[in-house]
Amino acid sequence: MWRLKIAEGGNNPYIYSTNNFVGRQTWEFDPEAGTPEERAQVEEARENFWRDRFLIKPSSDLLWRFQFLSEKKFKQRIPQVKVQDGEEITREIATTALRRSVHLVSALQASDGHWCAENSGPMFFVPPMVFSLYITGHLNAVFSAEHCKEILRYIYCHPNEDGGWGLHIEGHSAMFSTVLNYNWLGKLGEGRDGGKDNACERARRRILDHGSATAISSWGKTWLAILGVYEWDGCNPMPPEFWAFPTFFPIHPARMLCYCRLTYMAMSYLYGKKFVGPITPLILQLREEIYNEPYDQINWSRMRHLCAKEDNYYAHTLTQIILWDAIYMLGEPLLKRWPFNKLREKALKITMDHIHYEDENSQYITIGSVEKPLLMLACWHEDPNGDAFKKHLARIPDYVWLGEDGIKIQSFGSQVWDTSFVLQALIASNLPSETGPTLEKGHNFIKNSQVTQNPSGDFRRMFRHISKGSWTFSDKDHGWQVSDCTAESLKCCLLFSMMPPELVGEKMGPQRMYDAVNVIISLQSKNGGCSAWEPAGAGSWMEWLNPVEFLADLVIEHEYVECTSSSLQALVLFKKLYPEHRRKEIEIFILNAVRFTEEIQQPDGSWYGNWGICFLSGTWFGLKGLAAAGKTYYNCTAVRKGVEFLLQTQRDDGGWGESYLSCPKKIYVPLEGNRSNLVQTALAMMGLILGGQGERDPTPLHRAAKLLINSQTELGDFPQQELSGCFMRNCMLHYSEYRDIFPTWALAEYCKLFPLPSKND
């Protein structure tokens, strides 16, 4: 039986930590673990997911919940409540529903103080990890038979009915995901016509019917070339020479978004080496299966710009095509000849130096799951027996996550992000006697997770930004600062500093708060908005060079309403508690952040959410930031418009429901069938509370609260519904803890807002 381990490094000599592994979460299989009842519970969850896999695509993330609740012997002892039609919500009903949720959420806290959760959903995260381990000969050493069993379960749980796999688990079938997943099925021993429900045969038919693997998008072409089932001649150039250019070069990688930069850092190294894994009989077999013509007769050069229409969200511009063709036809032939080949050798060394730097400063976790297998392969190519590769292997478990739908690869983990929101929800519940120990442990986790050093050495020369004082999205070892994660964590520390230390522990020292403020201020742009990881500033024209057909706005840093709102909230609260620290700078920051928030509001009153779905999420952030700055329905047009947007989109059942299609289409798209989503309902409900709706007409809030209360399960949680996260416009993420965080938080704010009638009144 699988067990989730918390804050453990194991006995591996190639793994190390900056904070004794606080926040680390790894799955291990123990054949002796579990009672017959516990094993039956897990099997039932798996069977239920399989039965309903086309109805609710995200998992409910039940396996670790079963484990934690069993270990803590949790029983929900507060009776379930419902609001009948025509019945008024009473103080007892609302408070009871809130307490039931708070008790459950508290029981789900990990031993080190954080909350675990799946953070996955894209269907292209697993294959590269399998490919890299297959190429390096470590597949069976890293993934046991039990791992492979659960990885296969995941792939069989998430195909579409046409046999393909989507970019993410709710998406239409994409050539990129379908080809990659078909290929890794072979690595795990599934034959040409094998797989559950004829998965391999159905996937292959879909690939061939839609143009074959030659129509895979550029990232797919790169991985297939690395694997040996595609030729590098069919890839557009990714010259490592860009890393050798001076930083004033207009398209130098230093100007790129960190995720784009690190992805192409590794890809350019492998491209420059024309790296190809071992050509095994399986590779030769795959070459015969995924193309409509014989492999040795394909004109690879003509395939470089080919991309299946279902993958082509961001079509390549003429400028890109001309640039790539020039490098392909003129630059690449030159760089293979003396003396220009010396430049390539130098560029490859520079690139590898950057790879080692990034690896070491993330404790070999790396920045994310797209980059991890590429960077690991580069290290293996340089030295298959080197310590760098062994340190990479030691951190693969950090990405592995298990649900009732099987094993998937996470983006990298959302430990800090989720925990900061859970803690704010618990603080808002105003139940100190019931949450004190939970809050203290969570407070300690936040304090232990703050990054306390900048990247090593001359980090500016390595194109890195300050990180001292920041918080990451996942854990301290990850190392990558994020503005909104820093702001939300700082808010927690500030709120805890206002509470009795005997209840929540000693407050964090002022200097560490000053360091956090320094990071936040450094990430505000001239337009008042805040970027996520590094200061924005590159020209927007660089997005014309976006090489990734299925994503958008990923070449450079941008400013986001979420980052701006979180940063604004944190600095407003900080200013109240530390009024003299950088007072003038913070006042200017707040004014500019408010201006940015107002300026980017959509004509219909909403805000586009970049990291959530979509306008409902963005509008909550927009209203929350403005409210923190003292803006109200009566003194701010933007608040009034935001409130009107929420009122106009409320459903008949009192809830809200928005489709993930809003993200790529950039217009509000409701869920099909007039459905409501509880996470979105909670966000919209809190947005209305922030906009003062309770003072004018609380009816919409009562209707929303009724839906949340009546949707609460017997256990005290809320049912899993659609995906709730997004990145780069077109790919969705599963934040499994959101289903409890936001309904709990909304009920807490609702109970604080109203002097609800008692049933005894």
Curated annotation (Swiss-Prot):
Q: Which reaction does it catalyse?
A: (S)-2,3-epoxysqualene = lupeol
Q: Which GO terms describe its biological process?
A: triterpenoid biosynthetic process
Which CDD domains does the UniProt entry name for this protein?
SQCY_1
List the GO terms this entry assigns under cellular component, sorted alphabetically: lipid droplet
**Entry annotation: catalytic residues:** 484
- Functional description taken from the UniProt entry: Oxidosqualene cyclase that specifically catalyzes the biosynthesis of lupeol.
Q: Family, per the entry? A: Belongs to the terpene cyclase/mutase family.
What is this protein identified as?
Lupeol synthase
Gene this protein is translated from: LUS
